[in-house]
Amino acid sequence: MFSGSIVALVTPLDTDGEVDYNSLKSLVDYHIKAGTNGIVAVGTTGESATLSVEEHVKLVMKTLEFADGRIPVIAGTGANATHEAVTFSKLFHDSGVAGCLSVTPYYNKPTQEGLFQHYKAISEATDIPQILYNVPGRTAVDLLPETVARLAELDNIVALKDATGDLDRVAITRELCGENFIQLSGDDATALDFVKLGGHGVISVTSNIAAKDMATMFALAAQGKFEEAEIINQRLMPLHNDLFVEANPIPVKWAAHRLGMITHSDIRLPLTELSLSAQPTVEQALKSAGLLK
């Protein structure tokens, strides 16, 4: 259902801070041409935290429109209030989204039982396939493998995006949830190793600007050609790392603009554009990856 290289798509903005739908269409077409296996619209990289509900819904629907059935679209639907996460998921009922990506509730630090009840409520409210999203570095809460296993028993909770960077969890989660439960890395730098250990793919920041390389790398991995995949991975490693020299998605939006993929690198406050001191680092990473001369 979900595998390979799935992009956590940036949300292009104009200089007035409004969504640039022309650039969005270009990005969708770019990923289809490059062989990307799926698009996450309005996740963390898509600046979900600073979009209004109306913008959020329109962005997902426009992404679906531009995709036109040519690539699966996953809607970001996470919130730190359960009723809001439920509402977001229900808004996309019959929309054509392939699934919903729902981050753990952030800031309010629920217990494991609270996390279970949160996702259970979402599961009961919709039949859209749900992807759990664990990123404790941003949310201050860790969805433990034992809780994932409880949730995996619910019919439409089908996958986990694991952005912990803890590769030991791949085998633990596989043992607890079974091999059919989909595990997706949320950490580009360790994603290939994640797949070597039994994961199914990645939801990627790097893929925003190196989509063909990422798609090829994970296609090779799926064929067991890990040595060939590792050659690509090592070339992209500076990008995997330096796209986080400042908070995501600041560097990747700057890089996408530098490559002419989006019209502007604007980002909504409280995030600010990539600092002058960090720009040479990202520029060099683009050159190391072969994306700039």
Curated annotation (Swiss-Prot):
EC number: 4.3.3.7
KW Lyase (keyword) present: yes
Binding site for pyruvate: 45, 203
GO molecular function, one term: 4-hydroxy-tetrahydrodipicolinate synthase activity
Keyword ATP-binding: no
Subcellular compartments: Cytoplasm
Record-annotated active site: 133 (proton donor/acceptor), 161 (schiff-base intermediate with substrate)
Any one of the GO BP annotations: lysine biosynthetic process via diaminopimelate
Family: Belongs to the DapA family.
Name by which UniProt lists this protein: 4-hydroxy-tetrahydrodipicolinate synthase
Protein source organism: Aliivibrio fischeri (strain ATCC 700601 / ES114) (Vibrio fischeri)
